[in-house]
């Protein structure tokens, strides 16, 4: 044995002097040699000799340790102590790592030696053991003291250095059978001063003895640190020190790609250094994007039946809705920050059912298929895993001295897995288990870890760590010993000190998803399960937001990077101040044995009596205050000063929380607090006598405070309830954004604190109601009603980022969560009910919402608050100031940069370790969910292999033709052969761009006159068109078919009416494209049926149903006749054509007309198709350039006024009104008089035209000019509101005035007003037009909005997007035309009601009639369109009345 000990000591010395990395590689080589030359012993020789050795080596000591001067009084010790002695510093024992740093030149002498008898035969054995602390009578007589903390190396005491414990016993005492006790030594300089009392020196020796793990182990860490300072530090070592916040540079021994195995499999890298085992993985959070969405069935809380909802997994919240379009009205929410697990139900053979367990309840779901259920479970597991991690990267740092053992486990069949059991810290001695899987280098990595643990100076068995038993420290720790030690009673906790704690951003969890609450214990600690771990651990900014009395008390340690510190202390996260919030240490009574029940007081959902009374000072353990100045105080902003990890650990009656996976704090005062020793000093022990007086004072204070609270409670409890109900029905409001920093009255601190507590309660309830993050700041609350079918009374919440509503009627659960960024505008209108005041909120891509208030002041205050917050958010976005989402993006970018730097440093040092992905997991049904960096996925190529002959069919004015010219030029660039089929007057313009032209009959001017005079598709329009336009429609259909022959793809404006039939005849794919909404939606009304006021989603949807039926019924007879005679196709109907399933391309910007949420996947909003004609050969006239230059020199605003080729009754009058308005508004005008070029047929052509007004010098008249050039030279534009002209002015970033005449012009004028970038002039006149000119040229708010919108539109590429959409939906369009061709080739004897392919529409909402019923009624009631009757007013000027 002695020879073995000598060899071990020599080997350890060689490790210290040499390189640790080389030693590990040498040990690996020995293992390989042993494997190759291993001797197989026969069966009788395989038994262990452990029993004999135990009987021989581990005999009991002959005598217990002896102490001197046991009769000395403690008060005598105090009297003998010098005033200059600081007992706090004197009893702060140094760690074993510090002993080697003392000066070697200082002579020391032995003060006292205590001999310990040893059994015979052990005299020459140099392997010494620690004595059992339970045998020391002095320590057994003292209370259960907290563990001793080591002081940081940088802290130097002003007193002489304390006595050091000798590392090795003197050899001359070996023969006598006595083992020399640790020698208490002092320097010669110290002996000149007065010595400390004997008991003081003895207690110091005991403290140092408890710190040292073993006397025969050398100080590897200190040697490494000294060598690392002298040698050159590698880039990887520097980066690891920065990321994991080491105290010093550490030598990197090995690096391996590995996977952290928990409920998911996380890709990362393991870094093995001289002192730590580190794991790093880049895991970005996806807070602002929807991860998965789809339909699921959910079981109710009390109703076991399943109901079908549409689910969306976004951020940390799983939200479900009644329909996929009501994304602002959630039916329910599941906050996955409280999530524990997600798993498939084992008893389900079909694997359709799965459950999600949270701290509150268990949710049951049913998917449509087994793959869908599996995908949902994996997505939920990923989100739960991410939500439990702090930051955008996973960091785990395991000190090697804390590692108990490393065990090979077979968790998954396709990788090597090891289990690392590590002691969390020296406060609770909780044992964590971490599982790491290796798909490559697995055996090598596990061997390196085992070698490093066995050779480390901190290698101790679990029994030594927990109980301090006297076992041979040279024995390697085994799994059997660890398991036996873990079952030890916690009453044997020693005062030993671990040099470091486990630090992690992620909690250690079981590698298997728990199936029941009894299996939720992630680690085995002592002898009791720790089932409360997952539910109550604190995880930083995305952590479990448990009650303040539980979640905030956990001394969990996390990496103190920029992410964790920036989100832990936000506004509104404070808790009521308690006495134990200060930096006071607590001393347990000697009769109180620590147990697991006290370590985890939050293990149960129902609070115990001690938890209820935790706010009382009476029920706390005795408190030892360092000084009055160290107490923490609450600052005026409602935040608390950051506390050190020890302060966190001392909460809950001095017992730290069970979950204590350690934290890293920045160096400074916080570290000084955390490094203070937990072992009570002699100075502190003297204060024990004052505890009864402190308890009495605290009890008296408690009685006084409680009596006052109870008295006020009885007096105000019932009154407060009445006031709440009265305030709710009275409809009051409250603002919560008053800065607390303005309060300067210190006398009112208690009043302010009480008000702040009430305010904080309201804010917490607001966040809990809507599952919002802690960063959401409540601004104001109101009471009012949301108006859907019936008014629903409730409470409005306005935060800095959301507008929320919650119904208060019993039996209702309506909620609204509307992000402020989705609100386009807010309008004040009349209420639907008498005596109420309305507020309309216009939402991007959604129908407008209506609200009502009892008082106009409340309505106005709510509108102003919303406008202010909307403007603030827009200003922050424009100015570049980071909002919350951008802050998260910046943190994610920082984490990505950190990952890249670490990868670069890793590749420089370990180039042979490349990551090997588990390629066989796809075939394993129960393989864990895999998380890894998202690679850059390349998109699929949808472009056809050969060029196509594409025809664009359209009719209308110049603005209707121009977008198709732009699209055809893009198709030409793609190699296709485009053709435009339209009116003959545009032939020269089309061919000038190199595009083939095909003629379509029809006069666009005649059609425009019909629309202006009768309104767009009104009863008068249909009656006149039915009588006079029969021949016009026949010519249009025949010429359109001729123009489209030979085409391989047809793109048509739906106003041409012939395209869908031609595509059916030619059996070619068919697309629709238009400049205004033509597809059924609740977001916008039909562009041809625009009301004067907002009418809601039900009305909007019904306008499309009405128009489709009227439009088809008016043309059905001629169309079916043309199909039969010309095309040879059978007659059709609106239901058989299914026009709403045709792929659609909208050529307007999504920034102007946001895609509605209820659009199908084949409906695309591509962006404007601009035809840039100003950048070619066109040159502006010199007169125009001079006019613009003179206006700029005079400091005048320049506006453009042009209403295109609109036909007006009195062109001269309109010109004079424009002149007068320009002069009144004091602006310069560029006038394009296109309205005088066309003459109304009602006027006599033989009459001479009226005299034109005299044009003043402030106005310059032009014939035409490219919009892309002209609009960039002016300040505002006024036009008729066509799609192309509106897009041109908005792209230039200038405010727009729209004077609508017919068609889609009313729609775009409404959109311009809703966006706040222009003015709509519905009632024309000199004064109204002049006021509009004044506003658009001087309203800075409107000017800024227009400029921002212009930047967004200019960044789009509408033509390129449209071409890609054509490629993407081409196969879908072919499938539709094949289906129609198959039906036409079938026998004509099919039943008329054959609905195999009939379109099935889900009508969104419950507040509108069935569209199918309306379609049939309209079809039956429109038989006599040509009947005589009074002509109704145009629908473009007023809202129609719908029965």
From Swiss-Prot:
Limits of the GRAM domain: 240-284, 765-870
Catalysed reaction equations from the record: a sterol + UDP-alpha-D-glucose = a sterol 3-beta-D-glucoside + UDP + H(+); ergosterol + UDP-alpha-D-glucose = ergosteryl 3-beta-D-glucoside + UDP + H(+)
Coiled coil segments of this chain: 883-910
Pfam families xrefs: EryCIII-like_C, Glyco_transf_28, GRAM, PH
Region of interest (Disordered), ranges: 1-69, 88-187, 463-657, 1385-1443
Role according to the record: Sterol glycosyltransferase responsible for the glycosylation of ergosterol to form ergosterol-glucoside.
Protein name per Swiss-Prot or TrEMBL: Sterol 3-beta-glucosyltransferase ATG26
Species: Gibberella zeae (strain ATCC MYA-4620 / CBS 123657 / FGSC 9075 / NRRL 31084 / PH-1) (Wheat head blight fungus)
